[in-house]
A protein has these predicted regions:
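AMP-binding/adenylate-forming core of the ANL superfamily
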Residues: 244-270, 275-277, 330
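Thiotemplate assembly-line natural product biosynthesis machinery
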Residues: 1-27, 53, 87, 119
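AMP-binding/adenylate-forming
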Residues: 100-113, 122-179, 192
Length: 377
């Protein structure tokens, strides 16, 4: 069962995420170690928005609170009574989807993944607890393993040789592991690394093992489902966890063994065997950037309204390119690539940090294949 401190961490991380949505120095919010002070410093609009988010997470009407402590007490009581948390997908237009998970589902998932982490002595969390990935592996998993959790800011340049201990499970995300690999730091002994939220390049997984990582686990799942499958090595398909039943006919469907509702796999995938799958991913509609759901069509709509832009396309980078968005632009007459600066300035005023494309490519027409269909670049 969750404790009041667990609820406090969930709400504190949700608060930080709300503040980070509109700040260029987003990481500084997550380094802040006094969430009560962050709460007290909220503007009226920010507090109203956060109170709405908190209410939706615990399936309650939005309610005003004078302090973070009062909010924690109220929603801890709500959780004890209803046994439910809605995990919210982080939409880019202000709307989000509620993904309800009951305490039965939480317990089933935590116990269902437990066997993967035998020998773990401590969990080091680099991810927020209000998203399902962070919740499952840094809130619920420590309870079933009987180990402590330490939450640290995800700074690749930190002195990890001193911060980590043998037997640690480091719960991270693709961008952090990419930075680690680029820095070329060797891992301390007996470190287990975990990753989810978006696909990891096989070359990156191999590189982490070259840096003396003891064990790597990549989780495939979604906010709607929770953890579905895992893999440990490059070029492997994902093995489905035992608490899922799979129907591979036509569209791949799955359901929890404790439940009765079948649902379609959240991504396109192909089956290697009855319980092994290879996700093919979503590249155009909803993607994740640093753990936040981002919608490329929304970014395209904003970008297309700039007078310099005749046509544009926005996609998630391929794993070997990075973990941000990229944009392809066809310019109107009278504009050239030297106008990229004004386009960037315009976008920074309209988009969140996670929505901002990291790279821009220019050309006379949008990329298409021989059949005239849109293609990557």
């Amino acid at each position: 069962m969750l404790t009041k401190n667990d609820i406090k961490r969930i709400l504190s991380d949700a608060l930080r995420a709300e503040l980070a949505r509109t700040r260029q120095d987003a990481l500084s919010v997550f380094e802040h170690d006094n969430p009560a002070a962050l709460f007290n410093a909220l503007t009226v609009a920010q507090r109203s928005r956060f109170e709405e988010v908190a209410g939706d997470m615990f399936n309650q009407p939005a309610k005003h609170f004078s302090s973070l402590e009062n909010m924690v007490n109220y929603y801890y009581a709500a959780f004890l009574y209803y046994g439910l948390i809605n995990f919210l997908t982080s939409g880019t237009t202000g709307a989000y989807k509620k993904c309800p998970h009951t305490i039965t589902m939480m317990d089933e998932e935590a116990n269902g993944v437990k066997a993967e982490f035998a020998g773990v002595k401590r969990i080091v969390s680099l991810v927020p607890a209000h998203h399902l990935y962070g919740f499952t592996f840094t809130v619920m998993l420590p309870h079933v393993l009987g180990v402590e959790t330490v939450a640290l800011p995800p700074l690749p340049t930190a002195n990890w040789q001193e911060l980590l201990q043998p037997g640690d499970l480091v719960v991270g995300f693709p961008l952090f592991w990419q930075y680690w690999a680029e820095n070329g730091k060797e891992f301390p002994p007996e470190i287990h690394a975990l990753c989810a939220t978006s696909p990891l390049a096989d070359e990156l997984i191999a590189r982490l093992y070259e840096l003396k990582l003891a064990r790597f686990t990549e989780i495939y799942g979604a906010s709607e489902t929770g953890a579905i499958a895992r893999r440990h090595h490059a070029n492997e398909s994902f093995e489905v966890f035992d608490f899922w039943e799979i129907d591979p006919n036509d569209q791949i469907r799955l359901k929890r063994k404790s439940g009765s509702r079948w649902q379609v796999l959240p991504d396109q995938a192909e089956m290697d065997s009855p319980r092994r799958l290879r996700p093919l991913g979503r590249t155009d509609y909803c993607v994740q950037v640093a753990g936040i759901n981002v919608y490329p069509p929304h970014v395209e709509e904003v970008l297309s309204k700039h007078p310099a832009v005749k046509a544009c396309k926005v996609r998630l980078m391929r794993p070997e390119e990075g973990f941000r968005l990229k944009a392809f632009i066809v310019l109107n007459d009278g504009y050239n690539e030297s106008h990229l600066g004004i386009i960037r300035t315009y976008l920074s005023q309209k988009l969140t940090v996670h929505e901002m494309p990291r790279s821009f490519t220019f050309g006379p027409q949008l990329p298409v294949n021989d059949l005239g269909k849109a293609q990557d670049w």
